[in-house]
């Protein structure tokens, strides 16, 4: 490949609307160009990277025993009505009509199409298990597309759907796909974590996300120093608290005239923030609920919504709070409520003795409060808080927090989609059985942006070698003035390619500084310079993308540096 015959268009300017490093560098490197909000054209350069990711994903899916298919991107409303997702998916589902006024959607995911295909193709347990995958463009009508291809409306995704007779078989394929994903992200050269996760709108019984670790990540992750435990903070749990100590103080009311937060109350009383309790008032279909967490903790909305009876809860308004507790927000607590209320206590709150709560009296709190003496034992005890950096994990290690970019997700869906679309088989006993499904997604275009977020410096991208558009670029100094240099560079290029390296020749005739800056911006792992001076000395100038300086090497030394 000669770059003089390749479309390569880099820029020095940083676009004003590009917030993330990956967005800025992809635009500057000429990998993508914006067509409309959330819609991007992938240039020849960008497509080379995209195809390399795609190739590794395809190889590992094939290795894992999945078989490739291609579902339509446009899908009929009837399928989505059957699963209830025509309405449930919300505004992200792009809905269209054809000339006959029949309704369709541009699929953001393909559970319905996969289940319908399985219904048509699979009729006996003897055909199971089967795992179908595709690599296809998807569309989600994001309200505010941003961050370039990180949160675009149109994106390239690998999605797979497996079908099984039993839950045990579904679980085996789930583990098989988790192993395949681990191989994929390892081969791509990414620092990643597989974390326990909430199933969200897809649904299902078990779920795990794969995150690329990056400071700019939108998701908070927790992982233990004691094992491979890792989880999204939506689901992460710490070790169980120590057993509750015996009460040692009498309950009494103290004045806190302007102290409405746990931090202010703790400072006024001169006590540890951990001894205070935060009361969060919410409304459910069944009525008013008071959720309690320690003052140094924060309520986890996902966990709280999973407490029986709290699905779909909302924060209570001031009128509702006054009606049930008899006071204004800022002084709320579970003692002496105006009406009977349900109390949901976090595990750490249930383990407290001699704690501090709002008195349900304006300008006052209660100190020395104890369960079973001053108020009944909590009706419900559950883990409803976010974990905190440095606390003890269940495995005995310490929890560490990091930011991550989700690039893959695996689900055990169970039978919900197959049941809705009547995807059944005849089992060993001759009876009709609804198939079990698994679902496994990888954001291929998102991986490209995530890799840049994790691997860059002030000069540009630093690609992991498997993702780089070329592993090596041979740079020619003054190609138009010295045919001998060009000939030597071409000969070197041919040898590199013969040695199994993906290499290109930069014969564009740019000034050396501009050419080298481009190579750094593009993230080329290895740069080799062929010049008249070098040829006279029998050497090539070599520099790895992450090296501080270049070095002069003979051909044997060069190939050794390149691992050949």
From Swiss-Prot:
Entry similarity comment: Belongs to the class-II aminoacyl-tRNA synthetase family. ProS type 1 subfamily.
What functional role does this protein have? Catalyzes the attachment of proline to tRNA(Pro) in a two-step reaction: proline is first activated by ATP to form Pro-AMP and then transferred to the acceptor end of tRNA(Pro). As ProRS can inadvertently accommodate and process non-cognate amino acids such as alanine and cysteine, to avoid such errors it has two additional distinct editing activities against alanine. One activity is designated as 'pretransfer' editing and involves the tRNA(Pro)-independent hydrolysis of activated Ala-AMP.
By its UniProt entry, which Gene3D superfamilies does this protein fall under? Anticodon-binding domain, Bira Bifunctional Protein, Domain 2, YbaK/aminoacyl-tRNA synthetase-associated domain
> Reaction(s) catalyzed by this protein?
tRNA(Pro) + L-proline + ATP = L-prolyl-tRNA(Pro) + AMP + diphosphate
Known EC number: 6.1.1.15
Listed under subunit, the entry gives: Homodimer.
Q: Which InterPro entries match?
A: aa-tRNA-synt_IIb, aa-tRNA-synth_II, aa-tRNA-synth_II/BPL/LPL, Anticodon-bd, Anticodon-bd_dom_sf, Pro-tRNA-ligase_IIa, Pro-tRNA-synth_IIa_bac-type, Pro-tRNA-Synthase_IIa_type1
Q: Where in the cell is it found?
A: Cytoplasm
Q: What's the protein called, per UniProt?
A: Proline--tRNA ligase
GO biological process annotation, one example: prolyl-tRNA aminoacylation
At the highest ranks, the source species' classification is: Bacteria, Pseudomonadati, Pseudomonadota, Gammaproteobacteria, Lysobacterales
């Amino acid at each position: 490949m000669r770059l003089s015959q390749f479309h390569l268009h880099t820029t020095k300017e940083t676009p004003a609307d590009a917030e993330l490093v990956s967005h800025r560098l992809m635009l500057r490197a000429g990998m993508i160009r914006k067509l409309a909000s959330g819609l991007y054209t992938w240039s020849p350069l960008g497509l080379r990277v995209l195809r390399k990711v795609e190739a590794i994903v395809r190889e590992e899916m094939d290795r894992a025993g999945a078989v490739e298919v291609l579902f339509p991107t446009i899908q009929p409303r009837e399928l989505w009505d059957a699963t209830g997702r025509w309405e449930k998916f919300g505004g992200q589902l792009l809905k269209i009509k054809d000339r006959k006024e029949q309704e369709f959607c541009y699929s953001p995911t393909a559970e319905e199409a996969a289940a319908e295909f399985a219904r048509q193709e699979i009729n006996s347990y003897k055909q199971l298990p089967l795992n179908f995958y595709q690599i296809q463009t998807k569309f989600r009508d994001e309200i505010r597309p941003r961050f370039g291809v990180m949160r675009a409306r149109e994106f390239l995704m690998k999605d797979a759907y497996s079908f099984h007779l039993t839950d045990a078989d579904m679980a085996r394929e789930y583990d098989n796909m988790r192993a395949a994903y681990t191989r994929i992200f390892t081969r791509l050269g990414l620092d990643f974590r597989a974390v326990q996760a909430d199933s969200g709108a897809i649904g299902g019984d078990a779920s795990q996300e794969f995150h690329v670790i990056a400071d700019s990540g939108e998701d908070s992750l927790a992982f233990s120093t004691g094992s491979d435990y890792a989880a999204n903070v939506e689901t992460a749990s710490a070790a169980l608290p120590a057993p509750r100590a015996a009460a040692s103080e009498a309950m009494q009311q103290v004045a806190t005239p302007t102290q409405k937060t746990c931090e202010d109350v703790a400072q006024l009383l001169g006590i540890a923030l951990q001894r205070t309790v935060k009361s969060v008032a919410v409304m459910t279909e069944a009525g008013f609920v008071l959720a309690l967490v320690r003052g140094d903790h924060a309520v986890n909305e996902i966990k709280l919504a999973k407490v029986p009876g709290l699905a779909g809860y909302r924060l209570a308004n001031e009128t509702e709070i006054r009606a049930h507790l008899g006071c204004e927000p800022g002084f709320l607590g579970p003692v002496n409520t105006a009406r009977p209320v349900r109390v949901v206590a976090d595990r750490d709150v249930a383990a407290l003795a001699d704690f501090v709560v709002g008195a349900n009296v304006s300008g006052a709190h209660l100190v020395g409060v104890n369960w079973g003496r001053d108020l009944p034992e909590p009706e419900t005890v559950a883990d409803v808080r976010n974990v905190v950096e440095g606390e003890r994990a269940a495995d005995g290690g310490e929890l560490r927090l990091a930011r991550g970019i989700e690039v893959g997700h695996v689900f055990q869906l169970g039978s919900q989609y197959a049941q809705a679309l009547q995807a059944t088989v005849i089992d060993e006993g001759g009876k009709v059985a609804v198939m079990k499904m698994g679902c496994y997604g990888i954001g291929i275009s998102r991986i490209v942006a995530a890799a840049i977020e994790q691997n860059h410096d002030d000069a540009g991208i630093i690609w992991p070698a498997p993702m780089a558009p070329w592993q090596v670029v041979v740079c020619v100094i003054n190609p138009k003035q010295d045919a001998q240099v060009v000939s030597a560079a071409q000969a070197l290029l041919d040898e590199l390619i013969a040695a199994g390296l993906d290499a290109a020749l930069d014969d564009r005739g740019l000034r050396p500084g501009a050419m080298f800056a481009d190579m750094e911006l593009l993230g080329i792992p290895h740069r080799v310079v062929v010049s008249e001076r070098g040829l006279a000395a029998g050497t090539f100038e070599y520099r790895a993308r992450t090296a501080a300086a270049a070095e002069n090497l003979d051909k044997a030394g060069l190939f050794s540096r390149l691992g050949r």
